[in-house]
Structure formats: structure tokens, C-alpha cells
């Protein structure tokens, strides 16, 4: 899968229960549209969505399950329970929160990564800073993604992608770096590839029409 997505675009097709497009059928069609536009991989949330997307597109899928737990702020594939659910989908890669925060039930990140790999599936570490990426590489993940930069209490929220972090990771890591998080424009995408990232995930800017519409409405209101 990593060879297939090198230098190409991955599109995130997700709609949570409180969002207008929440439906495996709709996400399957969204992924098909992304494929027709040139995407070579899909990041998707939830067992039903992943199965539908794989059936409709045949593209490799990075699978996640978002689930909230009372004893942790981690919600992207937080525990072994979500991993086991994802292993039933046939997704080629599982992404999980690899930040320094405490996992639900105090589960161990290193053991989760080992478990996924023992089941023959690639692992993407969603990180928020440099140290987390280094640790994830030591734990044996196949790639790191900058998904959570700006989304942890100890990282700075930026308007756009964390170019500084990406550049540093590309320079220092031996595994592929995937750009993800606030890649909002084709110009952003071009820049992250110029920094040397392996691939990039774009989500909201392509597949969340309520947010896209909101940007246009705000432009009117400003004037």
C-alpha cells in the first residue's frame, strides 16, 4: 500500500453520526468520486463504511474507529476492541492515536502496535509532535501521520498544515511521513510534497460539504 500511495493523494471520507452525510452508502459514493478525481487511497471511519468503500472502489483503505471513553482523551482507535473490529474489514492499514496521552483502560501503545502487525496489517501512527513520531518509529509502525498536530493540549493550533513538523520528520525519520491535518488547498498540498512527504491525506476540504459551504458563507459575511 505504501508504494501505491507514494507521491499521490489519499482522501479521508468520514461522516460521524451527527453529520448530514453519515451513511455507509454515501461514504462509498464519496470515495468513488474521490477515486474518479485521482485519489489512490481512502482513510475511513467505522466498520460498515470501510467495507462499503472497499466494495465500491477497490482502493486500499486506512481504517480507524473513533470512539470516546470517559477515562481518556484518545478517541482514534483507542483500544484493542476497536483494532479487533477493524481487523474484520480487510483494511490494509490501521491508524491509531500515538500521542503521549493515557489510553483508555491504561492500554499500552507499543502492545497495540505489535498486535496489529502480528495480524498482518500495516500501522499508521497519528502523532502531534516530533517526540511522539520518534517513539512510534521505535515501536515499529510503518508510517507516521501529522494528523493530531494542534489537537493536543501541548501542541500549537495553526491555521494550516504544520509544515515545520513535517519538514523535521522527513529529515529525521527512516519511515514514511504522511501529511495530514489542515491541508486545505491545492497550494498546501503542493508545498507538503515539496517538503518530501511520502503522501498526503486530505479530508474536510474535499469531503465535508457543510464545512466547505461555511467557508463561503463566512467570506460573504466578512464583506
Swiss-Prot record:
Q: Could you tell me which cysteines form disulfide bridges?
A: none
Q: Which Pfam families match?
A: NanE (PF04131)
The record's annotation in InterPro entries points to: Aldolase_TIM, NanE, RibuloseP-bd_barrel
Q: What class of enzyme is it?
A: isomerase
GO terms of biological process kind: carbohydrate metabolic process; N-acetylmannosamine catabolic process; N-acetylneuraminate catabolic process
Metabolic or biological pathway: Amino-sugar metabolism; N-acetylneuraminate degradation; D-fructose 6-phosphate from N-acetylneuraminate: step 3/5
Superkingdom is Bacteria
Q: Which CDD domains match?
A: NanE (cd04729)
Report whether Isomerase shows up as a keyword of the record: yes
Task: Please write the reaction equations for the catalytic activity of this protein.
Answer: an N-acyl-D-glucosamine 6-phosphate = an N-acyl-D-mannosamine 6-phosphate
What UniProt keywords are attached to this protein's entry? Answer: Carbohydrate metabolism, Isomerase
Q: Name one GO cellular component term.
A: cytosol
Q: Which family does it belong to?
A: Belongs to the NanE family.
Name this protein carries in UniProt: Putative N-acetylmannosamine-6-phosphate 2-epimerase
